[in-house]
């Protein structure tokens, strides 16, 4: 046997190893693990494989500096909470660490097992903690550099126990609250910034986003299914500089999982539930990823379907469990690498919700009985599409998003007057929006200076039509059509004053043209058409400033000033249409945070905020019993919030959160001077606690258990004595157990463990405010489910 081939191979291997060990300039932008691995492989001349679906949706920060290829790959793996395994001289595999749910705990107690040729990571002192990149910052800011109160919910946590909507967010974040008219019809509030109980011409106080595009402008929460998400980010407000109008309370951003360019898989869940004093429920979910062009393009699709059994009875109609709700939703994302460092995403989403009847009951009647003599209910349909181009040129990043949304909500309310024939009030809210945003930025990361500049355009049209149905009679009630065209430029710049101290200044200028007209007006008003049609221009300048200081690794404090606004519009009162003014919020806050939730042994975030809210827009009940809108005065809101968690053992984590709100309307308008004293719909105190337990129970089985309880304090329904009923003051609870592995698992969950009736919302129909209505919690529900992947 000749030795030359062996000697030649050894020389090549030594040469390759020497080249890999040589330090070189590395600059890999922030992105998902597969995106970062591709960029890393190009720059280091190595082969890097990321095949585990658990890792493909994780995000990594920018990796920048001079280092060898092995050092760079180890750093990439560490930032993803994974490990690098050398499979050859210049080839690597990035895989999850054993028992990833307890990775932080294991690292605290002992070094990881290097088995199967794993490359040992550098000592802890040489590798900084994995930074968490906040997508909602719009410029890839790490959590420790962000001067804001933010809550992050992992998508895998949301997926446990079957599909769900916004209620899964309110259960996990104490500062987020909601009305409870029904799925697809609710209003959301953050940080005690609440205006009213109804959805009318006023813009929402919370901005909701799917990726970079807003879900709606002045429509209710569409209650999208939270399936196949990387995570949800709740950024407390105001967020006027970055997000503009309609972010007084903050924003909720849904970050979907990106398609995986080199993977083919399908996952799904099936579930069946039984509700005490109610009908059975069923739900199903399917997720599919298809690689269209390996390494270049992929398609990811999600389908959700559910039928939730009712639990409200209407004895006057001799019907039980009337409020069954059916939901059908689908989402598709096509992701393509169109050039080095440039990608294209096309996203489409559709959802339809049908509520067969209302979900409120009589306060003093049997537990779940409604005294309505008519069939109510609602339909909520939502369509959404967006087109996203993103990339980078050197250190400069760019992202451009264009899209459209359509939301249609039809509601039926019992409008029967005492001693009169049965009557139904029907309201149709049809909203259409076209939006565009382009921004460029240089992330601060380890630089001295970072900045962001952007522009956005919004065109929104909202048509509100109403009618009364009494027997075969149909009579139209006055409606309104509001339109808005808005142009905005904004910017933000951060400067590192010294190591661990970053100052940020920002501003946004918005110019909007508002239009409005009455719909279905009476003949007398139609003759005077100039009195019911109006167009005007408004502008707003929203400055912001913040300072964040790192006291130690993982510990920082910050102070921030921010503003927000909502444009005015036209409101209906009786048979007349009138104008209401824009409102404006100014907030000063101070906060501190330590650690990374669910990763570090201990984490804590606290925040105190003071808000001055001028010309508050709110809804009230007019003389005809219909919802109307007006400016109710000026107010002040104090908010204190805290959240944290601690690992009691390697397997057991305790978490909790609480919020305290104090509000006053200190300069009410003349009409409301004797009717209001504080902001409605916000409890003075709310809090939650949870326990998470995870461990291996066999060679290929993991056990995950969750238990939680939350308390929602008392709040007032709305503005005026007609809406003065109290609500809240109840405890909700639940638990979930899953046993299985990544391929298949079974779940058992129970909601409303204590069987609490409670009162989530003291209104079901605005025409029967004297009936003392309540909206009870769904009775105790037990669900069995199975999830699978192949």
Where are these regions (language model features)?
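Membrane-embedded beta-barrel scaffold of Gram-negative outer-membrane proteins
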Residues: 132, 285, 388-393, 397-416, ...
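Transmembrane beta-barrel wall of Gram-negative outer-membrane proteins
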Residues: 267, 276-355, 381-383, 432, ...
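Structural signature of Gram-negative outer-membrane beta-barrels, strongest in the C-terminal barrel
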Residues: 334-340, 347-349, 440-442, 450, ...
